[in-house]
């Protein structure tokens, strides 16, 4: 491996001859950067949810890495382990495609080989149930997912991170209740969901078919 700053390293399985060939041919060569786990020292007023949000790491993953803590009574001055960001990217990375989402702008952009393809109006999670900024990847495809806790059918669902073990947040089309009532069509472009990224039905189907498992999804505040 090759050491970088802050303990990061480059992937171990690259062939230097491939790198040289790419350079000679003016081609692109993608490296994978491995991030180490980090330590965070609890400060006055910290809550685990706010630490998780700032660390761009799901709450439950920090809790799992620190099984002895009481999340409702953090001890000021104690150290927490923040898991490696690479744990959020478990699949082989699709390097030539990327999805970028802005919570502030309520927009999504798709890129291929570094070139902008499309821009979409979206809705992310409301402040009480926010979408978590961070770098993730498409991990699941489900033509119609169902969230029983909210009675929501979610078409063309792409799972990108687990808000809690087994509970996926993702990208999908406008959801419907079991009664057939469609939600949030009139508020696209504003925060509306329980944490997922919502799109109109046609756009969601297009993204579903375009983004295979492994495509990186970058969510910015």
Show where each model-derived region lies.
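Intrinsically disordered, low-complexity regulatory tails and linkers that flank structured modules
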Residues: 1-32
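Exported/periplasmic cell-wall-interacting domains
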Residues: 64, 148-221
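Solvent-exposed loop/turn segments at secondary-structure junctions
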Residues: 47-49, 106-108, 116-117, 126-129, ...
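Primarily a LysM-type cell-wall glycan-binding module
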Residues: 27-56
């Amino acid at each position: 491996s090759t050491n970088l700053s802050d303990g990061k390293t480059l992937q171990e399985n690259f062939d230097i001859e491939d790198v040289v060939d790419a350079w000679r041919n003016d081609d692109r060569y993608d490296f994978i950067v491995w991030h180490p786990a980090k330590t965070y020292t609890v400060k006055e007023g910290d809550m685990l949810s706010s630490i998780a949000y700032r660390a761009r790491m799901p709450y439950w993953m920090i809790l799992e890495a620190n099984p002895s803590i009481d999340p409702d009574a953090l001890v000021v001055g104690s150290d927490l382990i923040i898991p490696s960001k690479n744990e959020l990217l478990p699949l082989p990375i699709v390097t030539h495609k990327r999805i970028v989402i802005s919570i502030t702008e309520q927009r999504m952009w798709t890129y291929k080989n570094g070139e902008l393809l499309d821009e979409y109006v979206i809705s992310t999670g409301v402040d009480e149930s926010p979408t978590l900024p961070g770098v993730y990847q498409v991990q699941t495809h489900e033509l119609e997912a169902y969230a029983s806790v909210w009675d929501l059918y979610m078409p063309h669902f792409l799972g990108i991170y687990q808000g809690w073990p087994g509970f996926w947040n993702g990208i999908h089309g406008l959801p419907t209740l079991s009664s057939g009532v469609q939600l949030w069509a009139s508020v696209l472009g504003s925060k509306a969901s329980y944490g997922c990224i919502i799109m109109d039905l046609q756009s969601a189907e297009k993204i579903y078919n375009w983004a295979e498992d492994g495509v990186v999804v970058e969510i910015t505040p």
